[in-house]
Amino acid sequence: MADGKAGSLTGKVALVTGGSRGIGAGIVRRLAVEGASVAFTYSSSEEKARQLVREIESEGGQVSAFKADSGVVSDLESAVRQTAETLGPLDIFVSNAGILSLGTIDTYRLEDFDRMVNINVRAAFVGVQAAARSMNNGGRIIVIGSNTAIRTAFPGGTVYTLTKAALTGLVRGAAIDLAPRAITVNNVQPGPTLTEMTSDHVDLVKPLIPLKRMGDVSEIASLVTYLASRDAGFITGASVTIDGGYVA
């Protein structure tokens, strides 16, 4: 940003949903470092959103934050519209917002099921659809899924696994639909990643990972940035797992 060097995404406009903390914030930071003008949504972490905006702007980046509930169609569509009005037509869209609600299938409440599907699947579809409608040809769409789409690694994760597996189908279909416009659509499937939400579980999870460590947010962001770049123009419809061999 401020060092004067052109990054791999200089001149591009990106929108990241759920970008105020964790993996989402790491993606926002990395896209900005690579020269993109970045907008992101947040639902409740307003102070974290403001901090991230100040951080990126202090380093010379261009960033905007929009409050949006990913479960509300009009909020997502408004975020896409506001991004275009503020920064320009979209080149990159990252669907990152998601929730986790655990419960075994014999006890899981239907209300929780509906909310998980609404946020993790329906919102991803709505976001991809809205972004594609306003996106420049040759754009990039990246959905953040989970390695649980491959294997349910813990009891109570049935519905979460279901929602993340659904994203693999969404990406394959959207990749075909948008190929005539040279828009690529891919799915990044992180495994155990060190964030504020997972820090309490490191000692439990780390021994189960062949590389014997948690993933770093910066590693997820690096993969997303590559898929958003010109170099990844022939990759589409793919689900790429990044989990240190956890589901190998």
At which residue positions do the language-model features occur?
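Conserved glycine-rich Rossmann-like NAD(P)H-binding loop of the short-chain dehydrogenase/reductase
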Residues: E34-Q51
